[in-house]
Amino acid sequence: MVIASLESTHAISTSIVLSSDLWTEFYGTESVSSASPNYVKLTLPSYNKWHHQALISHCDNDDSLPFGSAGLPTNFIKQSQVRPMFSSIEIEPYVQQLPNLDNLVLSLNPDLFNELNQLSKEEQRKFLTLRFNLLFGITVLNVNQVVYPAFCKVTSSSNDFGILTDQTQIVLVPDSNVVEQSRSNDEFTEFDHLFSLHVKIQSLLDPVPVEFLSPPQPDTTDNDLFAFVQPNILLQLGVPSGTFVRVIAEEQEMLVQLFVLFAPNEYECDSLYVSPRVRYVFMNHARVIIQRPNLALNRFSVSNAVTLSRIGCQINAQRRYQDIISHHLALYFSEKQRIVKVGDLIPITFDSNYASMFTDDIRSGQHDTLVWFKVEEIESDSNEEYHIIDSSITRLSTVKITSRELMPKSICDYDRFYNLSPLFHYDEDAFPFAKRLKDILNTAIKCSARNVNVGTSIMLHSSSPNVGKTMLTRSVCAELGFHLIHVDCLSLTSNSNTSDATNKTIGYIRAKIETIISYVEKVVIFLSHLETILEDEQNQQDNTSSKMARQMNVEMADLIEEYTTKYKGTVFVGSTNDIDNIPAIVRSRIKFEIDVPVPTEKQRLQMFRWYFDPYVLNSQTPKLRSLISHNVPLQTVSVQSAGLTPMDIRSIVKAVKYKCYQRLKQNDLLIDMTDITAVINIARDRFSDSIGAPKIPNVTWDDIGGMDVVKGEIMDTIDMPLKHPELFSSGMKKRSGILFYGPPGTGKTLLAKAIASNFSLNFFSVKGPELLNMYIGESEANVRRVFQKARDAKPCVIFFDELDSVAPKRGNQGDSGGVMDRIVSQLLAELDGMSSGGDGVFVIGATNRPDLLDEALLRPGRFDKMLYLGISDTDKKQANIIKALTRKFTLESGIDILDIAKKCPFNYTGADFYALCSDALLNAMTRVAGEVDEKWEKYNMENKKNISLRYWFDNVANENDLKVVVKLQDFELAQQNLIPSVSEDELRHYLRLKSSFESQ
């Protein structure tokens, strides 16, 4: 890769040109006369440090270009007469095989589209070649590339880039945006210089690199005051780049140093882009006035003393953070010559993990916390408004905590600018529960502004842990500008049920709140894991424990009531993994309850897209960049991760990143689908028992033989709702319950797994004993949890094996408490929910004794599709089963599977045939092992050697000696020792059961 000087060719083309020295370095001297096209990869400079624009382009040689330079057409960099461009570009030869474009969509000027639409396809192609210089077989086009300003742009194609060929299907579409995007607001010839100018104000996403500053600035310049505009604003104000200007909005005013933005960039022409320090001052204003001042840098005087106050927040109010904050505050003013005035805001970032052990010798790592200070007073010998802080002269002191509204992240993404730990953004369309939380908090803000205190309190609850309740609260609070007081109740648990323990717990919570609540206006008091300190007094085993539990519950209820009514703009939010364990007295104080479910497929897709964004992926490791390959289908990844929580997804992304460290390429770690699939499989295997994560089994229809009729019935029941859900949108109930019954060993479990594999459904197997629990009510709760996990992992199959042990006829059981009857009743209720609101969840049961099942299970809407899986009654069906079981065997040539089937009785089940084939393979292996021993002994005798068997395998044996070939005699030997698992009498019994159920 070469850093080349960037030159503009002042032409419009789809090819670039290289200077002779670069051409020779890339392609040699012989390539000048070569007729084959050459291509390069360009990486354009970008103000977005996480997203660099890379283009593949055809290139030619230009002897007139200066040494070490590359000439780019104006349509590549959107250059105009008044817009300066970057001075350099990264360039390298592209030596890989370029893909051909199968299809291409071009957006055209509407007038041009109307003209071309009257031409034939061949005439359209000729026009594109003549007018836009698109050479078929040579030109490379990239998605979003401007082919000709104001007339033509690439909208989409079969690949991100590729060669335009004669076989490329070109689709032309009209698009007025092509014209609008080409218009440049900065192309002026004559205008009057303005003293002030109204513009929009926006926050920079990332700090601008020092090499992008024009003119260059000393290292000690206050970079927080850097502001950036397009050149048209500088021209209208009549000031050069690097000039100090005033930014004014109503009573707010600030001094900034104005710099020009180089092309190419995606910034707006009528906006001022500033750092979070400046944006915080003007956070309530969308537009500001830029005014030319009569001010020079050398007129700033050095202040003698500056007094700062702390902006109230939970971190700034805690003593344990003061040493590390003071250290970074001193660094902030010593590293740069900061220019301040009274009322300015000062941002300080630090690593909170080092707070408890911080010393001046420790250099903290990755910053994760931001606090703010306000300039209260400046002592100086001059009367100037703005002063420089010189760390060797100016005396700094901090005083009180002051109140100020927090800047919402919707206005300024300060986490990204300061490279703090990123917070997931909840899209309201994909996450309805996040939208509801935002709506409630916004309503609380509006009521507070009108002096109406509604005492808002919210409970976030879920049926599974680690679904992101804390992440949701932090994200929404940051987006809306709420201060957050977070207390994790897991750290407050106490083993002693005493009044003193209750007082300490409540006192600790109140102390956390009281230190800051007086200094903030919009605040959320967030208590997570409430169920760890709150207990229902009725569930206690003695009066003392019941009394202590009631005392804690009353104190917590009073705390919620007090802070939400006494302090305006205060919202209480609690979280729990089991809403039923929250005592009634506390729950009565909660006005809103929001269920936070396990992410759906759409929500998981949003999370994977966010986690694999270059900024999020590399924010903690900026020196070693990771990128996700373009061919990774995140939609498929979201399907494979069904049932996983946000914490699991975050762990998967981290593991994927570490897994691909070994494939280092150009300082970028390229993540591909193989890495992601491997990590997801490992995560599922590791956590399946603890989190109950369902899997997609690996059983195909080829593994099953002799069930063609049953397969057709299954396709009608399951395939139809999945492929055509619109047919059931009118209110028609789908059939989601299937019952397999028949003799044991006929493939009921295997068939259920094949269903899940064939339709890419997650598979959730439930055994009867694991539902039973000694505590009253827990067995029914286990049934509810099973169906809830299936809904979280949909599309999903719940498979109840040996259903007769789970749901026997009610009233016939002798168990105390009637637990089996209650399990059946709960199962019936859940099955009724499947037919109405359980889209994507299918229930399959398997039993050998359908006559023992509760009759209510077999009614319509539940297990209403009963399929008998019997024993194969023809030689052909038996041969199909043997063929499926032996498809991975090496059979002797000439062996006929039908001949094997003819020797088998008609009471062999599928399990019996499995035993037959397994024993035949074992017989073959035993036979081959004996033959190998004979060959080894014979070799030693003939050669008068005493070599080991291992040496014989490694050096003497050939491929045929190692191959296990199953012969007919192996099957005959296996059949002699095989006893059918179902007798003739039992088979007749199952046939009578079949006829009785089919006649109902």
From Swiss-Prot:
Q: Which SMART domains match?
A: AAA
Enumerate the InterPro entries for this protein.
AAA+_ATPase (IPR003593), AAA_ATPase_domain (IPR050168), ATPase_AAA_core (IPR003959), ATPase_AAA_CS (IPR003960), P-loop_NTPase (IPR027417), PEX6_4th_dom (IPR056995), RecA-like_PEX6_r2 (IPR047533)
Keyword entries, A-Z: ATP-binding, Cytoplasm, Hydrolase, Membrane, Nucleotide-binding, Peroxisome, Peroxisome biogenesis
One MF term in the entry's GO annotations? ATP hydrolysis activity
The UniProt entry, under Gene3D superfamilies, shows:
1.10.8.60, P-loop containing nucleotide triphosphate hydrolases (3.40.50.300)
Segments passing through the bilayer: none
EC number(s) on record? 3.6.4.-
* Cellular-component GO terms for this entry: cytosol; peroxisomal membrane
Q: Which major enzyme category is it? A: hydrolase
Name a biological process GO annotation. Answer: protein import into peroxisome matrix
Q: In what way does this protein cross or attach to the membrane?
A: Peripheral membrane protein
Top-rank taxon: Eukaryota
User: What coarse category fits the chief subcellular location reported for this protein?
Assistant: cytoplasm
Compartments where located: Cytoplasm, Cytosol; Peroxisome membrane
Catalysis: reaction(s): ATP + H2O = ADP + phosphate + H(+)
Q: What does this protein do?
A: Component of the PEX1-PEX6 AAA ATPase complex, a protein dislocase complex that mediates the ATP-dependent extraction of the PEX5 receptor from peroxisomal membranes, an essential step for PEX5 recycling. Specifically recognizes PEX5 monoubiquitinated at 'Cys-6', and pulls it out of the peroxisome lumen through the PEX2-PEX10-PEX12 retrotranslocation channel. Extraction by the PEX1-PEX6 AAA ATPase complex is accompanied by unfolding of the TPR repeats and release of bound cargo from PEX5.
UniProt lists the family membership as follows: Belongs to the AAA ATPase family.
Q: How does it assemble?
A: Interacts with PEX1; forming the PEX1-PEX6 AAA ATPase complex, which is composed of a heterohexamer formed by a trimer of PEX1-PEX6 dimers.
For this entry, the protein name equals Peroxisomal ATPase PEX6
